[in-house]
Amino acid sequence: MGASLSLVPVLDYFARREFLAAGLRPSAVTLPYPDGGAGATCTVHYWAPPGEPRLPPLLLVHGFGPRATWQWRCQVGPLSRHFHVIVPDLLGFGGTTYPSHAAAPPPSEATQAATLAALLDALPGMEGKRVAAAGTSYGGFVTYWLARAAGSGRVGPVVIASSDLLKTAADDRGFLKRAGEGWSSVDEILLPAEPAAMRKLLELASYRPPPRPMTPDFMLRDFIQKLFTENRERLVHLLKGITVGTDKFEVTPISQDVLIVWGDHDQLFPLEKAFAVQRSLNGSARLEVIKKTGHAPQLEDPARFNKVMLDFLLAAHKSQA
């Protein structure tokens, strides 16, 4: 009986309820696919309030992991009181689709950013309108690329959360060392196939990972099946598209106001990388470290995360008014 219990639909329900209560509604739009041939398209699923913006627009970009609704569920309520919040599923995640693997290369951060720019232009009342943007983890890579490519006239201010823009192969080796013995690759943990790998991912990503009695193997297998196994081929394809750490992803200062947010116990991207990212932006970015949180401070201490983010965004908006 226990093995038939699935928490995934329950978590989906509560996350969707937070979005609906914040006034956001699910929708989708078909757009030209940036890396496809003539006539290639992608379908982008997103959440946003209906109609044209009555408040300043804010784009929230999820990371490489569970659904966007899970990752931003604690933010949409407080943020929607001040901003027209737009939460897309990136290419290959959630309800967003792109051409088959055989027809197109895996989308890079640049491709993801170009798709988001096209989405913004396609939304009611958004063409050419300046939008604030925030991204977490992999979503921070995409947000940085979008801000740099679009420029400050289109995108800004910018929030980069738990996102090592300077990640290298040495960082991957450090990650495996922190994980302990028995792991041969980062992907083995980031795309878990067994309960032990899922438990290790939770341990590394969280300041207070759930105790083992609360994460029995049957429950973790269900999460693995629904979040990873059913989508494994696509997720592996997406990982191959990541260009951070290569000469295709060069970090240079951008003209927008930037807030960097990091958990002090992040074991995926350790805190020292936050200071390195800040230096790479000529030290002009503001850095906020949220204590007693790991890789997802927006979920582990949403009250603090939301205050830091709102203070920054509202001050930036006021200075532009």
Question: Model-predicted segments: where are they?
Answer:
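Alpha/beta-hydrolase fold catalytic core
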Residues: 1-58, 81-84, 314-321
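Active-site loop/oxyanion-hole signature of alpha/beta-hydrolase fold enzymes
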Residues: 34-37, 47, 77, 87-134, ...
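Flexible "cap/lid" loop of the alpha/beta hydrolase fold
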Residues: 141-148, 153-193
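Catalytic active-site module of serine/aspartate enzymes centered on a nucleophile-bearing elbow/loop
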Residues: 283-321
